[in-house]
């Protein structure tokens, strides 16, 4: 494991509710969303170019597509923007009082898209898996604030955060990624330190977690030990 920190400000910007930074390695750009501002932002650090795109609805996450464009987790479901900016629904499932939140792309190409109620009703959200062929499966249906999702480098474990639980949970992955079992806590964030929100997994298999209301980023080992 490396020991350098390399922490700095990549870009100064503003948002009503900024969320979901994603590195698009193909295009060499950073993508993130302003959920309540209904905008997708991009930034190319090599050129300094920035773009802002308005979305159809409040947007919880935006991920790059292999065919170009973006897949977006919106208020009423999951949609697609093609390379020319044309919009279409991939999974349209309106639910009054609820919106899409964080989402992540699995090693098999499926999109795991979370949702939550605007008033954070306990158990009012879900975690949905959208297969590459568009088939939708509800994996969890008792979620409050569905947030970070990520996979171990070997694809055998999935990590997941439902923010109010204060936990980073881990599942075992089966059937090429289409099924998860054995949910259990990997780590728990102590009272007063903030709440776990977004996450990503590094090449060492360690889990990096951003803490909402904690002004911090932590790294946990695959065994659940806090090492940064």
What are these regions (language model features)?
Residues 6-12, 48-54, 87-93, 135-141, ...:
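A short beta-strand motif characteristic of beta-propeller blades
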Residues 35-36, 118-124, 163-166, 212-213:
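Short, solvent-exposed loop/turn segments at conserved positions within beta-propeller repeat blades
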Residues 31-33, 72-73, 111-115, 160-161, ...:
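Residue position within the beta-strands of beta-propeller blades
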Residues 167, 171, 188-225:
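Loop/turn-rich, solvent-exposed surfaces of beta-rich toroidal or solenoidal domains
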Residues 84-139:
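Hydrophobic alpha-helical segments and helix pairs
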Residues 12-27, 56-74, 95-110, 140-157, ...:
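Beta-rich, blade/repeat-based domains predominating
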